[in-house]
């Protein structure tokens, strides 16, 4: 024990702390520089689920808007839907070019305000094509406001976009898309209460010939959160609209099915003994019926008269028989 007694210098070092080692971080303990303040009101929310229904809506909207642009510009555009981006609003806003057409919309009955954003490149492409241009003389972005002519083209495109977006939502959850107003500066939009609030941003890339443009649909996550379960797990078969398409296709295929129509001219009751006595040249008298019933697969479908037309035997339809009602009548107990 005597050999383990500390010297006075060592005791002073323990009491006062070793100035040479006091700044060295202790393993496993975070230093002050690694600690960041946490504000629960501004931290971004983590959305891990894939919004499958929103992807379906975006694809349908792209098809609708493509047809609308074709009717407007008389040129066939190619619209590609980008990946859905879930990001803070300030990240979305800082990447917008100037000038930018910002259109505020409501999706009733959802609470909140969304954005339909047309980039200047898309606006200039639409104006150029609408007035017969082919893109050889691109318009330069100079930070100016849009002209009255450009604004009129924007309004026509926006009307097509809002109609298409409303139709795209009908299959999942019908919403009324309502235009609020337009802005050119993002600071006047205020679709979120904080720059760090999460938004759901979908970019759309438009190609017309060799020219490309872009527009975005940006929705606050708080706006569509009431539909979160529906957007994550879309209904089976995606929509009633697709169910109707399936029915229509089935009806068309059934209508093109080939059936054999059989018309019995007469029935002659004979015994087996009489049939066995028949020989070539025998004559079996029959009575010509006033009407003949035609069958499909044993089910009566129509009554007709028998005759000739242009030298060919033919049937003239007199009355259509409902095969379902006829079958039900036959199945009823007598």
Swiss-Prot record:
What does altering residue 155 to E do? Altered motor bias with clockwise rotation, partially suppresses a yhjH disruption
**Which compartments is it annotated to reside in?**
Cell inner membrane; Bacterial flagellum basal body
Instruction: Give the record's keywords alphabetically.
Output: Bacterial flagellum, Cell inner membrane, Cell membrane, Chemotaxis, Flagellar rotation, Membrane
A GO term (biological process) for this protein? bacterial-type flagellum-dependent swarming motility
- Looking at the UniProt entry, the stretches that span the membrane are none
Lipid bilayer topology = Peripheral membrane protein
- Tell whether Cell membrane is among the UniProt keywords: yes
GO cellular component entries: bacterial-type flagellum basal body; plasma membrane
Its main subcellular localisation, reduced to a broad class, is membrane
Where are the annotated segments for Disordered?
15-40
Output one GO MF annotation: cytoskeletal motor activity
Q: Which InterPro entries match?
A: CheC-like_sf, Flag_FliM, FliN-like_C, SpoA-like_sf
Q: Which family does it belong to?
A: Belongs to the FliM family.
- Say what the protein does: FliM is one of three proteins (FliG, FliN, FliM) that forms the rotor-mounted switch complex (C ring), located at the base of the basal body. This complex interacts with the CheY and CheZ chemotaxis proteins, in addition to contacting components of the motor that determine the direction of flagellar rotation.
Official protein name in the record: Flagellar motor switch protein FliM
